[in-house]
């Protein structure tokens, strides 16, 4: 059928219990593997949820990397009426849930690239991040702000003593000649450090960035179509999560060493030292992910929603909800599958059947099981109760 260019309609008939819904799920699974953009409809929420549940089960059994690939499937409709969260796993393909999660990837506060950069900067120089976070100043900065005359005196001392064998450092000079200022600086720095030590900062910051990065990685490979994330990139994402877990385990109390600066009493995790191979590998992966995953510039819920609907391979909804696919700029649907088509009024069938670009339609149902219901006799006499089946 896919190779036929002419418009085509097929009927699949069968009484209850003959496997119609299972057939639909298998058909959709095959269309997914063929990357054929398909719309699947049903008259009711219950019917479309049954198809979605069967399809989700088939797809999950075939996935090699967690939920990578579910981004090619989207289910949409009224969340409260559908009660999607009563169906295990369907939340991962439900449009409202998908948009909510992707908005966090695109937002300015948790943007994907911003988080990658923050993690990279933190791993390369945690001490610098620590000093910046707590407002810790060097002795020179402290003197420049409050005791500039001491700096001037030290500069004069260095100029006079430039030929001496031993020239005191700024710390030694202040400690010897300005003991009261040295004590003032020491007390101020101790008070600042008492709020959070370097060890505490490293653990806290790594934990926060790690959780945020894991969430973003899992969100992207679950909710973005495969066309945006290649298999090679997916493997790097999985490796990144493994390294996050491994580095996190290394952050134990016995894994800390003195920093290289002998005057510094704080300690830095040994797993963060430059020689650590896991850190080197992780930094390379962060750089790779930053350049390989290019997210579109999307602002607001409506743009992300349209992006998800346009790029999905399989779209599932009720017949009446398919009106949403008439949005300007929407990618065309090639294949239409309608389950429980015998329950569908012919006039209602027109909504998905008028979609531009549609080439093939498959109707599944049993007209003797539960025909379309029309309450008004006038409407019934005019043929509104007739189904295409």
What are these regions (language model features)?
Residues 7-27:
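Walker A/P-loop
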Residues 21-36, 50-58, 354-355:
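Walker A/P-loop NTP-binding motif
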Residues 2-9, 31-33:
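Phosphate-binding P-loop
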Residues 16, 44, 366:
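Short, conserved phosphate/pyrophosphate- and ester-handling motifs at nucleotide-, phospho-/glycolipid
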Residues 34, 320-389:
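Conserved helicase motor core of SF1/SF2 NTP-dependent helicases
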Residues 37, 42, 46-330, 373-386:
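Conserved P-loop NTPase motor core of helicases/translocases
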Residues 10, 16, 38, 73, ...:
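Hydrophobic anchor at the start of a short beta-strand
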């Amino acid at each position: 059928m896919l190779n036929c260019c002419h418009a085509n309609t097929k009927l699949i008939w069968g009484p209850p219990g003959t496997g119609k819904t299972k057939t639909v799920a298998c058909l959709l699974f095959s269309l997914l593997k063929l990357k054929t953009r398909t719309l699947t409809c049903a008259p009711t929420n219950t019917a479309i949820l049954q198809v979605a549940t069967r399809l989700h089960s088939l797809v999950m059994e075939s996935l090699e990397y967690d939920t990578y690939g579910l981004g090619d499937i989207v289910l949409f409709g009224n969340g409260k009426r559908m009660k999607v969260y009563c169906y295990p796993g369907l939340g991962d393909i439900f449009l409202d849930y998908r948009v909510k999660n992707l908005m966090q990837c695109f937002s300015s506060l948790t943007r994907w690239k911003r988080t990658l950069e923050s993690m990279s900067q933190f791993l390369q120089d945690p001490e610098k991040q620590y000093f910046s976070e707590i407002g810790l100043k060097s002795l020179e900065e402290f003197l420049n702000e409050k005791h500039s005359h001491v700096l001037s005196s030290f500069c004069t001392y260095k100029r006079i003593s430039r030929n001496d064998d031993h020239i005191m450092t700024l710390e030694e000079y202040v400690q010897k000649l300005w003991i009261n200022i040295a004590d003032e600086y020491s007390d101020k720095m101790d008070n600042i450090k008492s709020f959070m030590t370097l060890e505490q900062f490293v653990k806290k910051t790594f934990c926060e960035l790690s959780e945020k990065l894991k969430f973003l990685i899992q969100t992207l490979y679950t909710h973005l179509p495969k066309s945006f994330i290649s298999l090679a990139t997916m493997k790097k994402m999985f490796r990144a999560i493994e390294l996050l877990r491994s580095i996190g385990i290394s952050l134990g109390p016995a894994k800390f060493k003195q920093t290289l600066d002998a005057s510094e009493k704080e300690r830095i995790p040994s797993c963060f030292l430059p020689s650590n191979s896991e850190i080197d590998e992780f930094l390379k992966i962060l750089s790779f992910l930053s350049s390989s995953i290019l997210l579109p510039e999307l602002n607001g819920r409506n743009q992300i929603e349209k992006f998800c609907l346009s790029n999905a391979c399989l779209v599932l909804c009720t017949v009446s909800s398919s009106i949403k696919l008439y949005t300007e700029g929407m990618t065309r649907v090639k294949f239409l599958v309608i389950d429980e088509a015998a329950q569908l009024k012919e006039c209602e069938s027109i909504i998905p059947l008028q979609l531009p670009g549609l080439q093939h339609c498959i109707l599944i149902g049993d007209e003797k099981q539960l025909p379309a219901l029309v309450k008004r006799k006038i409407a019934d006499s005019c043929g509104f109760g007739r189904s295409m089946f």
